[in-house]
Amino acid sequence: MVTLRILTTDDWPLWRDLRLAALSDAPHAFKARLADWHHGGEGRWRARLHLPGAHHVAALLDGPAGSDGPDATPVGLADGLPGADGVRELRSVWVGPKARGRGVADRLLEEVERWARASGGSTLRLAVLPGNEPAITLYRRHGFTVLAEPGGPFAGGATRELVMAKSLR
């Protein structure tokens, strides 16, 4: 069973481990690089979790004792960040290889969407690398559509992100 944990700054070791695993497993899917974060100290990890108004979520597979106890396995993460004019950003979605196909990504997206609505958001927006078909399919299944606006440059500027959004109204 999958349990979601809303992270606080005290959860920085868990977030660090998940973030490094994501950057190591899927470097093609993120603007940040493993080298950018690999040597970050506790202060840097805590600061990322302390962004005002942000919502950080970890997914854990229950261990034999159940719930998200010490034997639970961290398998995924997602972040929600506040933006201007009612826009909320979905960022850093990742699910580890052993947990893929179990609905973990669906649960993470549903939780960030719940937060976005509860925090007064009118739009949930994301950026994804063109060609990342598993992610694009996931986002479309959750009601996101591609916007005409160009995304930011990706990996040296050769590729631009695909911007997708979903109305929360």
Residue ranges and their predicted role:
Residues S122-R125, L129-I136, R141-R169:
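C-terminal "cap" of GNAT-fold acetyltransferases
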Residues I6-K98, D106-E111, W115, P150-G152, ...:
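Acetyl-CoA-dependent GNAT
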Residues G86, R102, A118-S122:
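Short coil/turn segments at alpha/beta junctions that flank glycine-rich nucleotide-binding fingerprints
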Residues G96-K98, R102, P130-G131:
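Active-site acidic-Proline motif in GNAT/NAT acetyltransferases
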Residues L14, G103, P134:
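Residues that form or flank phosphate/diphosphate-binding pockets in enzymes
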Residues D25, R114-A118, P134, T145:
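Conserved amphipathic alpha-helical interaction elements at protein-protein interfaces in regulatory
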Residues R100, R117, R140:
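Short polybasic/polar patches that bind polyanions
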Residues M1-R5:
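Extreme N-terminal starter segment of soluble prokaryotic enzymes
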